[in-house]
Amino acid sequence: MLQGPFRVPSFNGYIPRRLQPWIYLLFAFIFLMSGGIYGGAMSQVMGEYSLMREDVLMIIMFNVVGVAMPFPFLFKMKFHFTNRQLLLNAALVVATCNFLIMWTDSVPLMCILAYIAGFFKLCGTFECMSTIQLWMTSKRDFTIFFPLLYCIVLGNMFLSPWVTEHLIYIYQDWRIINWAMTGALLLVALIVYVTTHDFRFMKPLPFISLDYLGCILWSAWMLEFIFFFTYGEHYNWLDSKIMQMDVLLFILTGYFCIQRMFHIRHPYIEPAAWKYKRLIPLLILFAFVEFMGSTPKVLQTAFTGGVLHFGNITTNVLNFVEWTGAIAGCLFCLFWCKVLHQKYTRLLTIGVATMVCYPVMMYFLIHPGLNIEALYLPCFLRSFGNAIFFCMLTVYLEELMPFQHFFMGLTMAGIIRNGPMSAMCSGLYSFGLRHQMAENMSRGLPYDATNLLMLSIRNLYGITCLIGIAVLIIFLLWDVQPVRSTLKKMPSWNFVGKRMKKKKGFAK
């Protein structure tokens, strides 16, 4: 065991040991901040390139799907390439995508660049966080590691649009965030190149048995699902031949994914990974989190823009409020598990309760003269509950699945939470809002368009309240038990590498 402060083995000796993990934490933060087209720049991109809102959303969803797909490959990369090689490649690839996406108006090309950027930013983030995991928790405790990890991951989800919109407001150009992130990523590459050296803790494993085609098929399957719900309102759902063709492709792609999973030796997701008894209920809970989290994307945006007439800068403060909620939720998970020593599964009930508070409060707050400050508490509570769910469900997933299937399980959870469920709920809310508006107008109510919109939004928030309260009652009546009485510990990288070597038959 190393004596003294934690040390990153790949750093050169002149870098202070106490500073080394903080540098990697900064790298992870920069990777997570990066992307292709940034959500905070949506309106500017739409205006400059004359794109539809659905086009820009689809580009962003390509990036989100790209983030979900590398998990089954991550350890194979870690045990073949050095830390220095992985960070250099990830930083340069994401920087290149950020640069190139500024100079094309082709939506398909922007989608591809966004997907590649998402894929490699996850690779860079994993390499940083896996390197400093013993600094974060010397006891290899997942109930410490995941809350701290999600402080950065979820924090960046809300901090990125906040930073983006402020930069665009100051410089009046949506490309400023791409320039900033390109510069930051090139700085990461320069620091890695100058201050690190190649270090291996074991002999490299051959870079084989990677199901690239399976990764592409599962990605296409997710994106076809997202396309249907993103463009559904625009093309009038199944009345359009484009939507009919998309449904047909979705069915065919799903068939090929399943057939390939059962008929090759090393599939992208192994069939055994789907057979755990509690996996399906767990994925349903991930879907519920996405359902509750999708309400701000349609209803809150329609309310703040269509009823209150707030601009982007005014509503941007809500991103900061949600950032504080996410950090508070992750730290509360640490407090619950490590100070109060309570079962992590009981936190799920608290998470449901705080998430349900959001639509309940919004239902009663909807008013044409509402101040922006009135939205702080419901947004904080929603983000707080969302963070609790993400932390504890990931711990539960890790407890449910052995380590060889855990990263496949993260991709399976990503199939639910990284885009598809969010797109489906947003599409259904958009359809519901249009349907409510048409119904209210046909009833001849003595209201103008703004009041009819407000009434429609309140009705949909009411439906969301009923669903959320029903789920909360289920959690109050059903005591979710941990998978085992004592939590598993993180395995050491040497142990994981030897297991992979033995499994693939590389050992002599």
What are these regions (language model features)?
Residues 2-7, 15-74, 124-125, 129, ...:
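Extracytoplasmic
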Residues 169-182, 231-241, 343, 430-468:
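A membrane-interface helix-boundary motif in multi-pass transporters
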Residues 2-4, 9, 13, 446-508:
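Transmembrane-helix exit segments and adjacent C-terminal regions of multi-pass membrane proteins
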Residues 45-47, 77-79, 110, 162-172, ...:
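Interfacial helix-cap and linker-helix signal at transmembrane-aqueous boundaries
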Residues 18-34, 39-40, 97, 268-436, ...:
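12-transmembrane solute porter fold
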Residues 63-65, 154-155, 323-324, 419-420:
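Short hydrophobic/small-residue motifs within alpha-helical transmembrane segments
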Residues 74-213:
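Helix-loop-helix hairpins in multi-pass membrane proteins, especially solute transporters
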Residues 169-284:
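Hydrophobic transmembrane-helix bundles of small-molecule transporters
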